[in-house]
Swiss-Prot record:
NCBIfam families: PRK00823.1-2, PRK00823.1-3. It comes from Rhizobium etli (strain ATCC 51251 / DSM 11541 / JCM 21823 / NBRC 15573 / CFN 42). Disulfide bonds: none annotated. One of its GO terms (biological process) is tetrahydrobiopterin biosynthetic process. The keyword Amino-acid biosynthesis does not apply. It catalyses: (4aS,6R)-4a-hydroxy-L-erythro-5,6,7,8-tetrahydrobiopterin = (6R)-L-erythro-6,7-dihydrobiopterin + H2O. InterPro entries: PCD_sf, Pterin_deHydtase. Pfam families: Pterin_4a. It comes from the Bacteria. Its EC number is 4.2.1.96. The lineage of its organism: Bacteria, Pseudomonadati, Pseudomonadota, Alphaproteobacteria, Hyphomicrobiales. Belongs to the pterin-4-alpha-carbinolamine dehydratase family. One of its GO terms (molecular function) is 4-alpha-hydroxytetrahydrobiopterin dehydratase activity. This is Putative pterin-4-alpha-carbinolamine dehydratase. Keywords: Lyase.
Amino acid sequence: MKSERLERTAVEAELAGLAGWALNDAASSISKTFKFSNFIEAFGFMTEAAITAEKLNHHPEWFNVYSRVDVTLNTHDAGGLTELDFKLARAMEKAAARRLR
């Protein structure tokens, strides 16, 4: 099933509930940098996020160095952002919160 690209107003409404996520200038992707206390916590976050991404069949672009994980989300097939991006972002927030207490 193809996800429909969200209009900018819908994107901004979704983004309002996600602290620290930034919208790129073209409104085609969102990104965030997560900082953890060490590599194990960062990798644990990535592992949990990867399981969710696989369940959603929606995969992030990400980069990890030690305790930092940079994430960018968009839906290539839709040419921008869809509800899948925000579902994955919310799941990532929950995974991060379990490690950032």
